[in-house]
Regions:
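Conserved acidic segment of CheY-like receiver
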Residues: 2-14, 18-19
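A structural micro-motif
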Residues: 3, 28-29, 77
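Conserved sequence signature across two-component system core domains
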Residues: 8-9, 34, 52
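Short hydrophobic helical patches associated with two-component signaling proteins
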Residues: 17-22, 112
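A structural signal for short coil/turn segments at secondary-structure junctions
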Residues: 25-26, 74
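A generic structural motif
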Residues: 26-31, 47
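Conserved Asp/Asn-Gly motif in the active-site loop of CheY-like receiver
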Residues: 31-38
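CheY-like receiver
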Residues: 41-130
Length: 131
């Protein structure tokens, strides 16, 4: 089964780069993308993605607010947060919310492959166990 991906980042060049990641290698399809958290929340409700890849610092609603919203409404959604700030406080908040992973920008694509592979495997295992 194809996994649905939602990508959120307020920097167009980063958003474009994340969209060009070889998602199909992992059986994933991008269902939406947005440049602010508020639009991201609307897309979460519209598509109920399996994975949300979100920047932390965005206009309207930040990635932490988006992650809390998604986890409250769709607890099985896996969230990977991205940030250019190496801040312990962001990492703490991410852990408290229950995000799957936390990546620093600029994104190392080798590390991203590891994180996406691990996250997809976890989702598929959980889906299989629920059947």
């Amino acid at each position: 089964m194809e996994l649905k991906i939602l990508i959120l980042d307020d920097e167009y060049i980063i958003l474009d780069g994340l969209c060009s990641f070889p998602w199909e290698m992992y059986g994933c399809r991008i269902v939406g993308k947005a440049m602010d958290g508020e639009e991201g929340m609307e897309l979460i409700d519209r598509y109920q993605p399996d994975i949300i890849l979100s920047d932390i610092k965005m206009p309207e609603k930040d990635g932490i607010q988006v992650a809390k919203y998604a986890k409250e409404k769709y607890p099985d959604t896996e969230i990977i947060l991205l940030t250019g700030y190496d801040s312990f406080s962001y990492a703490q908040q991410a852990i408290t919310i229950g995000v799957a992973d936390y990546l620093l920008k600029p994104v190392n694509f080798r590390e991203m492959h590891e994180v996406i592979g691990k996250t997809c495997k976890k989702i598929r295992k959980n889906q299989f166990e629920r059947q």
